[in-house]
Design a protein with these regions (language model features):
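A beta-strand edge to alpha-helix "cap/lid" segment located at domain peripheries
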Residues: 2-10, 64-136
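Broad hydrophobic/π-residue packing in well-ordered secondary structure
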Residues: 22-26, 34, 38, 44, ...
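Short charge-dense sequence patches
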Residues: 13-24, 45, 58-64, 119
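Short, low-complexity N-terminal intrinsically disordered segments enriched in polar/charged residues
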Residues: 1-40, 135-136
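A solvent-exposed, acidic/Ser-Thr-rich amphipathic alpha-helical stretch
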Residues: 32-35, 39-87
């Protein structure tokens, strides 16, 4: 399964944005391939808002902790969809949704990444909430 996209702005270029490529790999057959886009000195924070099945939580760390987060995840039956994306220098922002395969929205996410000189993610912060939805 691959990530969807809508209304992407990438400073006038037609290539995929960083987050389109990252989520496509993360949602694909081998989620660990997404680590190809991650710098060795990564720092990250993933924040999940509470829903009916879990309390609010935050996951932090480096590249190996992100690998562990990927290992613990269940990626079957859903994917990331980038709705809007902007780039400012070496920083990219993406607003998107996670959706079940049938198209039903699971939650909304806001992600930001600082990219190194090789285009790999060096800093990453993402927050996800099931409460708010934005127009695509």
């Amino acid at each position: 399964m691959t990530s969807g996209q809508a209304d992407i702005v990438s400073q006038g270029t037609s290539h995929k944005t960083f987050f389109e490529r990252y989520f496509e790999l993360l949602d694909g057959q081998d989620p660990h391939r997404s680590l190809e886009l991650v710098a060795d000195d990564l720092e990250f924070s993933i924040q999940w808002a509470a829903d009916g099945s879990r309390k609010s939580s935050q996951f932090v760390g480096g590249r190996e902790e992100l690998r562990g987060f990927i290992d613990a995840g269940d990626t079957d039956g859903w994917a990331h969809y980038v709705l809007h994306s902007r780039v400012s220098g070496n920083v990219e922002f993406a607003l998107g949704e996670t959706r079940w395969d049938n198209g039903e929205r699971i939650g909304t996410f806001l992600a930001v990444a600082e990219l190194d000189e090789s285009g790999r993610m060096r800093r990453y912060m993402v927050a996800r909430s099931p409460v708010l939805a934005f127009p695509g």
